Amino acid sequence: MQENTRLRIAIQKSGRLSKESIELLSECGVKMHIHEQSLIAFSTNLPIDILRVRDDDIPGLIFDGVVDLGIIGENVLEENELERQSLGENPSYKLLKKLDFGYCRLSLALPQENKFQNLKDFEGLRIATSYPQLLKRFMKENGINYKNCMLTGSVEVAPRANLADAICDLVSSGATLQANNLKEVKVIYESRACLIQKENALSKEKQALVDKIMLRVAGVMQARESKYIMLHAPKEKLDKIQALLPGVERPTILPLAHDEKNVALHMVSKENLFWETMEALKEEGASSILVLPIEKMLK
């Protein structure tokens, strides 16, 4: 019965989302001990169990109501949703928040020597992919007939191995494509990590915990996007200096001891401060400019 009273969160056991999912939960105050071979981690300060599973399994665990929350890439989520729909099912879930990591794109790629003018160049080609449903939807929307070559891994080697004419695979930097003499020619899907919840209603206690976690997730993400700025500014240039700073709220202006001409300005900036902005601040007379990271933030 204990497991039914604890919030169950599914995350990727290993792979590109695993580390950042754990970091997000930790920054939200979820204390846990992760053992490499363990499939379940128990929070020591909150009634939360972390299930570490294959990313392909997370959507199904949410659709079937086995776990309460899941952190998953949009590409995997939508691929699994389309697969269920193709079987006549109607999978459902709640999208709680798009997260600030796991960015990638699903793209069509051809051998470097192939010329590419438009999507019609894929007509009749055999395309290797691990995302057959997303590829099928895109090709259908664009009226392209093709032959599917389903692979669960190492998709990029398919053209060299004469398994396929082209590929449809995830791309982050493009280095893997270049290493396999391929070129990216068309992005068909943009993806990032997201936090989802099962459709069935949670108990009052679990929902209260989810609400608390969501507030913390928002705070963590806002803190990551923000910087705390401190500087000294001439009173006569204060308006110009403030105009250079993209703030979340109005700044705090403080007097400086034994200085009638300058004040201290403290504020939270909603954007990273680039060197060009700092140089512009300096030109307007600002001095002692400090830009600090923010660990936690609640509005």
From Swiss-Prot:
EC number: 2.4.2.17
Regulation (activators, inhibitors): Feedback inhibited by histidine.
Needed cofactors: Mg(2+)
This protein's UniProt keywords: Amino-acid biosynthesis, ATP-binding, Cytoplasm, Glycosyltransferase, Histidine biosynthesis, Magnesium, Metal-binding, Nucleotide-binding, Transferase
Gene Ontology CC annotations of this record: cytoplasm
UniProt KW Ligase keyword: no
Catalytic activities: 1-(5-phospho-beta-D-ribosyl)-ATP + diphosphate = 5-phospho-alpha-D-ribose 1-diphosphate + ATP
Segment forming the signal sequence: none
Gene Ontology molecular function terms on file: ATP binding; ATP phosphoribosyltransferase activity; magnesium ion binding
Pathway per the UniProt entry: Amino-acid biosynthesis; L-histidine biosynthesis; L-histidine from 5-phospho-alpha-D-ribose 1-diphosphate: step 1/9
Annotated localization: Cytoplasm
Function: Catalyzes the condensation of ATP and 5-phosphoribose 1-diphosphate to form N'-(5'-phosphoribosyl)-ATP (PR-ATP). Has a crucial role in the pathway because the rate of histidine biosynthesis seems to be controlled primarily by regulation of HisG enzymatic activity.
Protein family according to the UniProt entry: Belongs to the ATP phosphoribosyltransferase family. Long subfamily.
Protein name: ATP phosphoribosyltransferase
